[in-house]
Structure formats: C-alpha cells, structure tokens
C-alpha cells in the first residue's frame, strides 16, 4: 500500500498543527506517474512524504501547499503536461498526462488523525470528499468528520473531488525468529499492517517491532484478528508449532499461506 506512510505522517501533522498540507490526486488523464488516490504530505520545513511524479512536479506543488497552509484554505491544481509545444521547447517534464490535485491544510482538519487510526485498525476504507464550496467530509467505518474551509481565490481548478483509500493489506506472521525484525520492517515499509503471533518468551521483543503482537495460540489469534489477514506466514522453526498453525489456518479463507522451511 502506498498510503500507509503519507497517512501516518498526515495524522501526526494534524495533531501537531505543524503547518503541513496533504495533497491528494483526485483525477488523472493520459500518462502519469501515479493514479487517483495517490497522496503526499508537504511539511513547512520542506520535508515530503510520498511522491506524485518522478520529482519534476513536486517543487511547484510544495510551493502551492505552503500558500494553502499559510492562508488556511483549500486549493486545487490542474497540472497538464500533454502540450506538444513543451516537447519542442525542451521544457517537457517526461510524461504526457494530466493530474488534478486537491491541497488540504492539515491544521484546519481537527480530528483527521482519528479517521486515519480507524482506517488503520480496519474499521473500513477511508473515503474523502471535497465539494466546490469548501466542505471536506471523510469517513472510515463509523468514524465521520466534516469541515468547512475557505477556497483559494486563485485556485486554478475546481477543488471538488473524491476518492476512496482501500484498507491496507494485512499479514499475520505465525512464529518469530532471528529474521523476524528485518522481515517485519520490510513489510511495514511496503505498507502492510503486520501482526506477529508468538507465545514463546524468548522471541517476544521489549520494543515495538510489529503493528500488533498476539501472545496466543494460532487458533485463538485467528478468531480475534479482525479484519482477517490477507496473507499468513508460518515460520516458527519448530515442527509442532508450525503444524499447529497450519491446522488452524486450514480452516480459514486466507488466500495466501506461506511456510518457511529448509531447502
């Protein structure tokens, strides 16, 4: 999922009121680096989380995002790189498409973090809708928020748009071992929500490694995990523990089950 890191950063920025803007792609045409639903967070200190192009469009987007935050208003951008004149003039940016962006100042969206948290916990997809008169509404499961913001007088495009961010993919890892920390880090970096199911004391870490840690039997953990995982990995390095997990997993509809074992 490309949404985990921008949304996590946007939640922290909203709570901190640190002058960041969330920029979301609400529509595209032609050849673009991203599709509708892509997003990035632009911070007041020139930090950026997420990409909307190969790097050619971000400087102008960041400039407009800073103005939106400073003015406390919604803004929109319509970036069209399909003009043949750009190719002949040598100013083409490497893609021939159109992006329609909505720019939202996170300081003006109190409670945004609770929606991101509900989405992350599996309450439901995160829907976001912006109307032309500045009403922003968002929902994740039963969590609903609505805000009304002024619209930039200089908005180069209609600010209206809507998108739905699907739930992040979820994986349950049954059994921990020496490779767990690295594997979990990779999965989280790729946007997965990671739960480790492990009862053996020697493998239970003192610090936060996964998004969730279940000190339960595989059967009890699977009964408790909601929503159900999209994938499961069995890797106890122990025959009986692996067998116990596989027996429990055989009763589920999880579409992918992987088993780590000797070659």
Predicted regions and their residues:
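Short glycine-rich, flexible loops that bind phosphorylated cofactors or substrates
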Residues: 240-242
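ADP-ribose/adenylate-binding Rossmann-like module
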Residues: 231-232, 236-237, 247-263
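Segments forming oxygen-rich coordination pockets for charged ligands
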Residues: 1-214, 227-231
């Amino acid at each position: 999922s490309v949404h985990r890191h921008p949304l996590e950063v946007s939640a922290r920025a909203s709570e901190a009121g640190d002058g960041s803007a969330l920029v979301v792609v609400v529509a595209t045409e032609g050849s673009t680096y991203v599709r509708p639903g892509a997003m990035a967070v632009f911070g007041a200190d020139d930090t950026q989380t997420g990409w909307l192009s190969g790097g050619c469009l971000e400087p102008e987007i960041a400039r407009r995002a800073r103005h939106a935050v400073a003015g406390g208003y919604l803004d929109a951008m319509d970036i069209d790189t399909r003009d043949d004149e750009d190719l002949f003039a040598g100013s083409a940016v490497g893609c021939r498409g159109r992006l329609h962006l909505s720019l939202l100042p996170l300081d003006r969206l109190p409670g945004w973090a609770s929606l991101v948290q509900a989405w992350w916990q599996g309450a439901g997809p995160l829907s976001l809708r912006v109307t032309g008169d500045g009403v922003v509404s968002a929902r994740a499961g039963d969590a609903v928020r609505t805000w009304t913001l002024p619209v930039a007088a200089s908005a180069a495009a209609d600010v209206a748009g809507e998108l739905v961010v699907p739930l992040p993919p979820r994986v349950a890892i049954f059994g921990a071992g020496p490779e767990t920390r690295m594997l979990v880090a990779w999965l989280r970096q790729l946007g997965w929500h990671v739960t480790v199911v492990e009862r053996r004391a020697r493998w239970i870490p003192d610090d936060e490694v996964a998004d969730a840690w279940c000190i339960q039997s595989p059967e009890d953990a699977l009964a408790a995990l909601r929503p159900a995982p999209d994938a499961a990995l069995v890797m106890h390095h122990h025959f009986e523990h692996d067998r116990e997990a596989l027996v429990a997993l055989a009763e589920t509809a999880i579409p992918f089950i992987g088993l780590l074992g000797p070659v």
